[in-house]
Amino acid sequence: MSDALGYEGKQVVMTGAATGMGAAAAELLVELGAEVFALDIADVKAPVHRFLRTDMKNRESIDSAIAELPEEIDVLFNCAGVPHPPASAFDTMMINFVGLRHLPDALLPRVRQGGAVSSIASTAGMAWKTNLDRVRGFLALETFEAGETWLKDDPELGADAYGFSKQCIIVYTQELAGELAKREVRITCISPSPTDTVFMTKLMGEMPKEAIEPFTPSNGRFAASLEMGRVLVLLGSDLAGFISGVNIPVDFGYCAEVAMGQRDNLMNIS
């Protein structure tokens, strides 16, 4: 394949590379010549440069992986995530955000000038503006342990742990953009609409089909993992060299329809 994306020989770190969007992106990155260091609790099938078994809700596990990663990194992809239910509210927040944030907070000093960070949020997190004070309050807890303690003591966590975790990713992405720009490092996230993954299969096993169908785009289908993986790979590439600080809905126009009043705003998108 052409090297227009600029991945040949690049050192790329990715969480959540075993399944779904992360697996699709990992396959593409290997094809594009990147050296991929994959972190996941499950086996990774893509022929990555190195696989590090990692539990993203366990600080010791994450720190052990960090110690094995290269001293210079070109791109970091945060793709690990679980649905709630069936995962507990606590585990959902720990994996989807607390562990997710711990990794880039440790690795950002290693990201080269011109490098990039990209994470998977969700259209379920698009109500972040209406919950900004609470999100910022959580982000102000700068350590892994402080976040863990807050989550254990929060009686409201179970109501929407998944949505809150994705709101945190979106706000975290935007808050870091200015500081990282001084080093010419970019940071972005994507908000997928429902996607045909193992993740979605688990979610649909816990929720009635009627609860998920209203969030399907007007093209009438869920996205494929590869359709999301391609966007991630693009955002980390040289072709996206001036894109930073944005959350990009990858939803075939779902959020646009909500904004134009053409669909009910079921997720309080703002």
Say what each PLM segment does.
Residues 81-86, 116-182, 194-195:
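Catalytic loop of short-chain dehydrogenase/reductase
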Residues 102, 162, 167-170, 189, ...:
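C-terminal helical subdomain
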Residues 109, 178-179, 241:
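Alpha-helical segment proximal to the catalytic Tyr-Lys
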Residues 11, 18-19:
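Conserved glycine-rich cofactor-binding loop
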Residues 2-4, 244-270:
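Short C-terminal tail/terminal secondary-structure segment
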